[in-house]
């Protein structure tokens, strides 16, 4: 039974840091918030003053330089994160201790939380403001002040976090290293395929359906692929995590046989 400490807190009877450390999640969330916030502030300052006519030198200097910056920084960011995850992978997963595996699930859910946070900024915030931008501004290029932030910054950002989440599971969790999880693939690849769908969307707006109607067939792919991520993540992946963590808790705390860990709940 938990006891009260001299500071008015509760003594859980165990060291929380052995199981969960929220610092990586806080670092990831605040890094994403700062990066996207900086881009949004930049857009608010220079969007209408330098971002309406793509033929002007000001547009080239301000917005196309931001486009180049976004492309380069996303390549560096993806290379650094994915490279670190791969080089530090666990090469002896067959002998992974159940307690260590259980702790890794907490860290993996932090990766997934950062991925979902990135999906929000790309699929909700920047896309909604892109739709409102098209309602009042006539585009003369596909590299609009709205697209440069949405498609060339927030989209690669959440794709990197999604691939990183998949790579973490594949290289550190036995459940996902032994076989391919269809729900996890759907949760990652579905939203990822929104980016090539953007190319189809831009082509269609240029040569087929000029009006920016929200219910236009060109936009159906955004909804369908977004729902793939939602159903794959909230349904299948969540069920797999709960089932595996339940078995691990039985082994760690209830002294159950490790035989239950050989059953992979796909």
Where are the regions a protein language model picked out?
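C-terminal transmembrane-bundle signature of multipass membrane proteins
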Residues: 181-266
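Alpha-helical transmembrane segments of multi-pass membrane proteins
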Residues: 31-49
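Juxtamembrane "helix-exit" motif on the non-cytosolic side of transmembrane helices
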Residues: 43-49, 122-138, 197-212
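Internal transmembrane alpha-helix with an interfacial aromatic "cap," most often the third helix
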Residues: 72-133, 165
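Membrane-proximal helix-loop-helix units in multi-pass membrane proteins
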Residues: 114-179
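Alpha-helical transmembrane segments and their helix-start/interface "positive-inside/aromatic belt" motifs
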Residues: 9-33, 98-113, 172-186, 240-243
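Perimembrane loop-to-helix junctions flanking transmembrane segments
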Residues: 47-66
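Hydrophobic cores of alpha-helical transmembrane segments in multi-pass inner/ER membrane proteins
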Residues: 2-4, 70-86, 152-165, 222-242
